[in-house]
């Protein structure tokens, strides 16, 4: 027996130990993009390195319960390597390392992968994953099997003991402040404490932990203190203004980068406005990524630092939990509340989150028209001017509009497509031609975003209602910058300004945090504030117990007993609508659709015929007529699809803003329900927009629509059946119905 135990320790356990050390060196090399830096980390932080190894060692010991141990070693090692390689790739695009929350973003990431990788790179990644999967399957089949008794009970005891040892090491290291579980800066934490610990911590550290002094008495004491905080005197009089917040993607003043030179100022409008208006630096919670956390802090006044490492509350709690925000507060004051974003509405789960934050409407890209795109296929911000003005005129009440832009988003290309895009701003100074080109691309996006700022303020100057406009950058772009590279010495700082179309705001210069800006604006306008805003108004960072009390407030509202609301939690999800304009069907007609001619293919065919090659090619490339049905209505766009049998029909063809075509060989039956829905790139829909009942095909089979036809349906408003109405209200079994019935 002793000999067997000896062999057990000298073989399997030793293999786990060696593998753990080798894996951690590889993971640190990948994370630091340098073997030398990884070795330096091991040399300078030996205890932290061994602690990280102990975590890997524990995961490897799970293979000791398997008869195919080599297979177990390889699978667990492969899992760690996948995480490390992913972190390596992510750090090539942004400053923030890969964490567990990014895995919740996988669906969103797939929709934008083409903006970060070329087609051949995507194919290569897919091929490598396929080869790896095939290798795992082959390894499982071919790997040797341990024969005899593997002593499961003793092995289990050993694994459990290893787990508790790791937990003990963690507690000792935390108490000794060798490591920390409070990551103010995720990149710095990964650099100081190692990839394995930081990533593992992001898996288990989610939400806000209960503060040690949290109690009903404490929260009621805080409530009583904040109830005494009243409103401030308005700086603009009694006529309450429309309030517009615009969050500018990756927006900064590039002149702060010490080594860059420009052919001209990329952002003259922003420069002028920040000099003339209340403005300052705005400390954001992230660098190069994390848009959702920036808007979370701005909208709520909450400090995201109290949440888990790298956590996005939008993805973990706000999809199922209401929260007080600027929107909920302004609704109490009679405002209509609107959100808009010129990118996918499902990104960061905004389509779920915004209804829990008090918004009446949400207009994502799927409900916008005349979108233009950058070279990297991000939506340009020029569309937002019209959307904001449309929203302002849509309601009779005052409006709160929260806008999130996207044009400045990375990745920034090292080659410019000057044949199809204009790049008037020239940038130099990095000492690297490819990097100069990336900065040139980025600064030209800033220039176009600045033109949007100028166009919007000009339109608002002519608007007949008072408007207060707040603009700010959500975070710095994902370039490899250090604090020493920028004039202000802080990579977490962007800038903001507060402007009024009535020129009736005071001019103040103040540097604040993102979670303070809503309070600052509300104080300027004399608005009634939420509890968090009252706290931010009365206390400032650095005051005694500031962090402790703010953390208690955030915990009480989101995870605690809500002691601050003894009469009950007042916030319910809104019955949020998507878009401002009604998308509707007027009638459906049977017809024939001829797709537009592919000019490129036609030219190629003509060249082939001229060269006396296979002339059949030209015939084959002629567009073939399609039989089916025309769906007529209003406010369609490229995201509008026919919806039938609880699913959208991907074959729907967008013809123009009032016409869709559905290729279909089978005839619709008289009385059949036909619906339309808006569907995003990720195939998630936003619910049924409108439904009609088909009146039947024309009696004369020759009466088919080509350009003009005759109406042959019953309008929804005239004769939609009770069954159809109930179907829209109850929704379908798909994600669309889930969204339309969440309220």
Where are these regions (language model features)?
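Alpha-helix initiation and N-capping motif
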Residues: 103-106, 192-196, 216-219, 267, ...
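Short alpha-helical interface patches
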Residues: 94, 102-115, 122-123, 200-208, ...
